[in-house]
Design a protein with these regions (language model features):
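Intrinsically disordered, low-complexity Ser/Thr/Pro/Gly-rich regulatory segments
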Residues: 1-190
Length: 190
């Protein structure tokens, strides 16, 4: 797990989610054949965020992309019959259907969910590609609209910044993200 995932996990915990990191989905051989690839490795969900009172689990893909151009809307809008690329769960409906169904069953088998648990796919991005002559945050807004239209959750860099800022108002904890928030926003520190 990388540090960016750790920050997102802390932000989710601050919003009353229980977080599980690097969850391997136990896709069966039969399910692998259903998605067109019989030798794929077990899919790994970066973060599972369980909100018990809502009976909801968000399966987060976490991409920092801080040293790259960032998440591109065009990459998320691609549709693949057989999964490929960096956003497989978002761009291949058949793969998503199989993996999320198996994930839900795995969670039920582990006592972490029940048949009524709502399972949602989410993306947290540390950086979003921004076109040169475009107002700031345009691409983030377009990505959010696109993902929400498909019933996915999207945390843009701006959303993450606001959540980090809100951490400054939390009581002190020996957590790097909370300490950093308190250093960056001392006026909000309690």
């Amino acid at each position: 797990m990388d540090h960016f995932e750790s920050i997102i996990a802390t932000l989710l915990e601050a919003e009353h989610y229980w977080v599980r990191r690097s969850f391997k989905v136990a896709v069966t051989k039969e399910e692998k054949h259903q998605v067109g690839k019989h030798s794929i490795p077990r899919p790994e969900i970066d973060l599972l965020a369980l909100h018990f009172s809502r009976n909801e689990v968000i399966a987060f893909e976490v991409k920092s992309f801080l040293n790259s151009p960032g998440v591109r809307l065009a990459d998320l809008q691609k549709e693949h019959e057989v999964q490929e690329g960096r956003y497989k769960l978002f761009t291949s409906q058949s793969y998503r259907k199989v993996v999320l169904a198996r994930l839900k069953q795995d969670l039920i088998d582990h006592g972490m969910a029940n048949s009524d648990t709502k399972l949602i796919l989410g993306l947290a991005a540390g950086k979003v590609y921004q076109k040169k002559k475009e107002p700031p945050m345009t691409q983030s807004k377009l990505i959010k609209e696109f993902l929400e239209k498909n019933n996915f959750v999207f945390w843009s860099p701006e959303d993450i910044k606001q959540r980090v800022k809100a951490l400054a108002e939390h009581p002190y904890e020996n957590d790097p993200a909370i300490i950093t928030a308190k250093i960056l926003f001392p006026e909000l520190t309690k």
